[in-house]
Amino acid sequence: MILGIGIDIIEIIRIKNAIERNSKFMKRVFTEKEIKYFEKINFRHESIAGRFAAKEAIVKALGTGFRNMKITDIEVINDKVGKPLVELKGGALEKIKVYKDVKIHLSISHNRDNAIAYSIIEGECI
């Protein structure tokens, strides 16, 4: 059954400005794995904004906000063909432990100005 749906859209320029204004932004928001991915793609702002929107969409699908979790508890990585995958840790993982067979679906897209992410979380009550 569907446990939650989340969507987020962000202007790419907002992420670009946040990175330029605050040297700690990347480490505060993204995991080491995510930052290594950004290094490989030359820190493209549209990709960074898409990952940020993905984290926000997942939190909305969880339905709890960031209470008792950090944004880095949500890690967005890619499979071998580039499909975005989600790994939950810490407080985010705790929020889904009350369900079994949890699947997190994620789609990320962007145009010149905006990045958008859509997430669906499926699972069964224990």
Swiss-Prot record:
**Main subcellular location:** cytoplasm
Gene3D superfamilies referenced in this protein's UniProt entry, alphabetically = 4'-phosphopantetheinyl transferase domain
Task: Identify the EC number(s).
Answer: 2.7.8.7
Q: Name one GO cellular component term.
A: cytoplasm
| Coiled-coil annotated residue ranges, if any | none
**GO biological process annotation, one example:** fatty acid biosynthetic process
Listed under catalytic activity are: apo-[ACP] + CoA = holo-[ACP] + adenosine 3',5'-bisphosphate + H(+)
Tell me where in or outside the cell this protein is found.
Answer: Cytoplasm
* GO molecular-function terms, A-Z: holo-[acyl-carrier-protein] synthase activity; magnesium ion binding
Cofactor field: Mg(2+)
Reply yes or no: does the keyword Lipid metabolism apply. yes
- Residues engaged in binding Mg(2+): D8, E56
Q: Which UniProt keywords apply?
A: Cytoplasm, Fatty acid biosynthesis, Fatty acid metabolism, Lipid biosynthesis, Lipid metabolism, Magnesium, Metal-binding, Transferase
Q: Give one Pfam family, short name only.
A: ACPS
Q: What does this protein do?
A: Transfers the 4'-phosphopantetheine moiety from coenzyme A to a Ser of acyl-carrier-protein.
Q: What is this protein called?
A: Holo-[acyl-carrier-protein] synthase
* Gene source species: Clostridium tetani (strain Massachusetts / E88)
